[in-house]
């Protein structure tokens, strides 16, 4: 008569398991609700499904319940799977539970991840629960505040099966609880993260968890770091002096750590505190707290300082092409270094030298790299930035080859930074802009061209390419402007005394070819004459520079005139009626000046097919001159205050028959025109239609 009992074992079929899960989960939540209402108790149910989804029911505020559970004393009653071996209750999704609190667990009843350890000492369990944060199944119970009693049987591996009773709530408790320490890795605490990361087997066998400092600051967010309690060889008392300090550091770690315990998979070093130090790599504020611990932990400082080194390189590498950004970044790493290592500073100068040598190879700029290497403390890199401008002048001459390499290497470095704009060495727009914006600097640098004029004449294209890269450097940062000057002197070809021809020679390879045909087609005559006159004058003045300078000066002057006329050309184009055809242009420009209707011959425009005309002109395709009709279009309806529309053509043609006849369409459209507009059309329509239209026009106007 009663319900059929099923055997309580894992369901293999996925479909049956999902259906059973949904039904029993709903029933469990319903029972929990009934229990909470009937007995006025607080109930919280957590279910971690096999799909890693979390299902929960809580009769009140879940965070409050979790906090109360976390800080509560030992459970009065605790049930696990062993209590329901033959029963109907189901915990099938997670299966395993923690042992009852008061009696030891038999070996045959232990879950698989408890097999390797003996029964729990009750006093350890009692000490464990008051400050409980990590679940017991992970095998890392912790000594509470004053007790240094590490358990001797904790090294079992973490398994995916989680206990379904109180430890699930505890595992869930940390992410949801209102404790002050924010989550770092997004999971509740380390034991749950170890499901996805490497297991906690890397911990030393007798290492209690990092939670020990007590309830006010649960630290589960810093999972896999073997915490402060000492390694088994050390007696518990070394832990005591470090505990308050470690607690403070853990608090700071939870608030400031920006990396989700990426260094945790490393096997922990002998001291527990160092595992924490490994995690606190990024925030430099924590390092002052490490200072008191340096004497016992000098061997640890070096592994701890090793993670920040790639970090400092990453900090410096993106802005290296920009000298401005480089010097402030150089200031920061020494500060980190001094904060991190008050005592072992031996590796730091070497690291700085390596960093600066890499910077020197990437931007071979000797005036900057040598002071930066010789002065490791923070202020001198600022001096490097300020000193760059004067020393670059004497150092220009020996550096053209270095600048070539710098121009080639800069784009690679700039790609590493998100803050730098598009690579200037590869931006064609910046090349053309720099060609004109950098001309004053070129003119300044043309006198030094005496030194290089002999070697430069043979390769003007190379000089132009080099100057192209140089102009990007000038645009990027002021200190690089001095560095760019050698390029300018290279690009100013043998005509050194004349500063005017130097810019044309510079932009020869960039702009020489294409603009000339454009000049012939687009530039009006008077402007082209001016441009050609200036070009010939410049070429005559630069005759000593050779044929190449003549050509480049002409091309550059043409480019200048072309750039000035580009802004002049577009306005006349809409109103140039000589270029307009009736079918091709569409509606006219209403703001264009009216053209006298006498230039276009009527025969020229009638040839356009009717299909090419706009639809509103289809009734009037045989007007003698549509091109003269367009400018008058918007002024046609001035008398009756109506905008033009196709209906204006159709309505007058009431009794005149089909509208496609040649005799009637012009008349039909002209019937509604005012005498003023007819006078405008007068020169075109000198045919007999006008005389015939006179009486009709009088009728319409009256």
Curated annotation (Swiss-Prot):
It holds the Pfam family SRF-TF. One of its GO terms (biological process) is positive regulation of transcription by RNA polymerase II. GO terms for molecular function: protein dimerization activity; RNA polymerase II transcription regulatory region sequence-specific DNA binding. Residues 180-195, 456-465, 554-567 have a biased composition (Polar residues). Keywords: DNA-binding, Nucleus, Transcription, Transcription regulation, Virulence. Residues 132-144, 201-241, 587-600 have a biased composition (Pro residues). Interacts with MAPK MPS1. Induction: Expressed in conidia but not in aerial hyphae or conidiophores. SMART domains: MADS. Residues 145-155, 273-284, 326-343, 350-371, 487-512, 530-553 have a biased composition (Low complexity). PANTHER family: SERUM RESPONSE FACTOR HOMOLOG (PTHR48019). Residues 693-702 have a biased composition (Basic and acidic residues). Signal peptide: none annotated. Residues 73-608, 658-702 are annotated as: Disordered. InterPro entries: MADS-box/MEF2_TF, MEF2-like_N, TF_MADSbox, TF_MADSbox_sf. PROSITE patterns: MADS_BOX_2. This is MADS-box MEF2 type transcription factor MIG1. Transcription factor acting downstream of the MPS1 MAP kinase (MAPK) cascade during conidiation and plant infection. Required for overcoming plant defense responses and the differentiation of secondary infectious hyphae in live plant cells. Disruption phenotype: Leads to reduced aerial hyphal growth and conidiation. Does not affect appressorium formation but impairs infectious growth. The keyword Glycoprotein does not apply. The MADS-box domain is essential for the function but dispensable for nuclear localization. Residues 1-61 form the MADS-box domain. Gene3D superfamilies: Transcription factor, MADS-box. It comes from Pyricularia oryzae (Rice blast fungus). Residues 86-96 have a biased composition (Acidic residues). GO terms for cellular component: nucleus.
